[in-house]
Amino acid sequence: MNIAFFTRPKQEITYLYTDYTVRQALEKMHNSSYTAVPVVDREGHYVATITEGDLLWFIVKGEGGEPHTMAIENLEQFKLTDVGLNKFKNQPISISSSIEDLIIRSMETNFVPIVDDRGIFIGIVTRRSIIKHYYEKNILPHE
């Protein structure tokens, strides 16, 4: 079994582009009900995972870094790159990585971004899909 078995392709999930505005990101996340989503550049490379908290703290810090100084209308002026994406928070793994690497990484986060050998984002593996698979394979048959 390999990582591709668990991977949900990017066509089936919500992700954002680095040039989206903060408003666009909030709308897309709200419509999908996800609290964290992958961010990719226009060439398709995985850049980071952004959370509702990242966006909230960007708004709260305001334009000058002072609390409560950002007007809602200004959310259209700022791109996701202005938010300060944390590229180390949810690093991707390669589609050719081992299942062991996938499981270890999934213990730290709700989903693991998957990239090809060129760093192109191809999808995610959710912690839920891993747990469900192992439950159905190892626990359910014994009940």
Description of each model-found segment:
Residues 1-13, 75-89:
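Bateman (tandem CBS) regulatory domains
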Residues 12-15, 53-63, 87-91:
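Short, mixed-charge, low-aromatic patches
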Residues 13-16, 46, 74, 90-93, ...:
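Short N-terminal micro-motifs specific to bacterial/archaeal maturation
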Residues 15-33, 39-41, 59, 91-109, ...:
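The conserved cystathionine-beta-synthase
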Residues 34, 46-63, 108, 121-139:
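Short beta->alpha transition motifs characteristic of CBS
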Residues 51, 56-81:
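Helix-adjacent hinge/juxtasegments
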